[in-house]
Amino acid sequence: GYIRTFELFDRTARVEIRQPWQSGIWNGVVDGTPTKVSREGWSDTFARFAVNLVGAPPLAGKAYADYRAATHVETIVGAALSVRLPTGQYLEDKLINLGSNRFTFSPQVGVHRQYYNWSFEATGTAWIYTDNNSFFNGNQLEQDPYYTMDGSVEYKFRSGIWVSAGAGIGLGGQSAVNGVERDNRREDFGWTASAGFPVTRSLGFKVAYFETEHWAKVGIASQTVSVGLVGSW
C-alpha cells in the first residue's frame, strides 16, 4: 500500500492506495453436502482521500513534531471518501470471488479528541454499493447501504508505546437478486485491541486483534490477528 500526507488549502490531507493479495479457503454445507473451495489472487483496489476540517494544521518534519509535543488538548474533525474499485479476480460462474465486480463508495466523518496521553475517537461511515450486473450465473445483484458507527480509546506512554481498544456496530446492507429481496439484513458488532512499539524515529511495530459477531441471520463471525510495520516520512 501507499500513504501520503500533504497540505491542501491550508488543511492536512492524506491519500491512501491499497492493493491486497488474498489466499483463502471457504468451508460450508450446500444442499446437505459439506463443500470446500479455495481462491488465490488479487482482490479489489482500495483508494481513500481524507482531509481535516478542524484542528491539526498542515505541518511537516520537526514543525509537526514540535506541535504534537506542545499540544496536549485538541479536537480534530475530519471527512473522508473511500472507493473500492472492481479490479480483483472475478468469475461470473462462481459464487465466491476475491473481487466484487462493482464499485463501493464510503463517505466518512470522524471526531478525534486528545486529552494529554489519552485519545478518543468516534467515526460514522456509509457503504454505498453500485449494482453487479454480472452476478452468479448472469443474475443482477443490488444492495442497500450499510451504515457503521465506531468508537475507540487510546493511551500513549512516554516511551512511545501505545495501547488502544475500540468497538463498533453495523446495520443494513440487505440485498436483492433480480429485484427479489433476500432475508440478509445485517446487524454486526465488533471489537479490537491493539498496541504499537517504536523501532526508530520513523518506523514502528504494530500488533492488533479483531473479533466480529452478528446478531442477525447473516453476518461474519471472525477472529483476526494482525502484525505489521508502520513507517512515516
Model-based region annotation:
Residues 1-4, 47-53, 81, 107-113, ...:
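Residues on the lipid-exposed face of transmembrane beta-strands in outer-membrane beta-barrel proteins
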Residues 10, 38-42, 206, 222:
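Generic structural signal for well-ordered secondary structure
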Residues 10-13, 56-59, 117-120, 160-163, ...:
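Repeated loop/turn-to-beta-strand initiation elements of outer-membrane beta-barrel proteins
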Residues 1-8, 12-14:
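N-terminal low-complexity, intrinsically disordered segments
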Residues 14, 20-142:
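Outer-membrane pore/translocation modules
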Residues 132-233:
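Outer membrane beta-barrel transmembrane domains
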Residues 1, 42-46, 102-106, 146-148, ...:
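Transmembrane beta-barrel architecture of outer-membrane proteins
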